[in-house]
Swiss-Prot record:
InterPro entries: dsDNA_mimic_put, Put_dsDNA_mimic_sf. Belongs to the putative dsDNA mimic protein family. It comes from the Bacteria. NCBIfam families: PRK05094.1. Gene3D superfamilies: dsDNA mimic, putative. It comes from Escherichia coli O139:H28 (strain E24377A / ETEC). May act as a double-stranded DNA (dsDNA) mimic. Probably regulates the activity of a dsDNA-binding protein. This is Putative double-stranded DNA mimic protein YciU.
Amino acid sequence: MDMDLNNRLTEDETLEQAYDIFLELAADNLDPADVLLFNLQFEERGGAELFDPAEDWQEHVDFDLNPDFFAEVVIGLADSEDGEINDVFARILLCREKDHKLCHIIWRE
C-alpha cells in the first residue's frame, strides 16, 4: 500500500468519519437496548476519542498499522461529561489516507 502523508484525514475528519460509520452500522451490530441507551445518553455522556491503534488489532488485520496512517476511534459513554469513555460500544480502526478507504470495527458484545 503506497500512502501519502500529505493526503491524510485530519484528526477531526477521522473522528467524524468514524462516528458516521458507527451511526450507520450500530443498529445492525449492537443489541437494541444498547442502541437505545447510547442514543438517550450520548448528548450528556457520549464521546468519540482518537488513539493510535492498540496492539490487539494485529489479531484482526494482517498489515502494518503505522500510526501515521491508521487511527483507532473509541465510541461510547463516560461517567461524566469530561470523563474518559469507560462504556465502549465500538472500537473503529480507520485508515487516514484519503485514497485508501479501510475500516474494521470491534463491536460491544
